Amino acid sequence: MAETETKHHPEHHDDDVHDANYQAPPEKTIEEIMAADQEDESLRRYKEALLGAAQTEKIIVEPNDPRKVIVKKLALVVEGRDDMELDLTGDLSQLKKQLFVIKEGVQYKVRIDFIVQREIVHGLKYVQKTSRLGVNVDKMKHMVGSYPPKKEIQFYLTPAEEAPSGTFSRGTYSVSSVFTDDDKHIHLEWDWTFEIKKDWA
């Protein structure tokens, strides 16, 4: 099963994930956020719109899971094709056995589906490092943003990336993904693989 609590690793992935010069603001509960700056009407309306139902009720989607962020799925999105999906709720060690095939040169996006429960989460980030034959060939880091608790699954879709192309680019690539936040909580990290081919088959 996926791990059931958020890990807090101040040093893990710091060089790749966190800006050493950035000081994250202190964590605040929903109650603290709503109580602050009440005299500012426009700010109050903004916070109400942002938090939605979370301002009046404690939103807990999965009571037996203590995490604030539960990452559900990764999908590779290519226009005109069915999404290629990885289930991130089971045995993460098995993900490398699921080989995605990507046609060289196509435009694709990565979508992360996740649940936020209990409290608002600040400064979510998605970092992906790609290597081939043990050599790092690409790294992308995306600021996902802050999200309130919701009963529905929320998602982040990266900007389009272009798959490598050409004879020497074909082959199998290893990917290490991390979903973290400003407070250096590692919500989930997982490894997966894809293969660049001349065509989809």
Regions found by a protein language model. Give the residues of each.
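N-terminal onset of structured domains
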Residues: 1-154, 159-172, 176-201
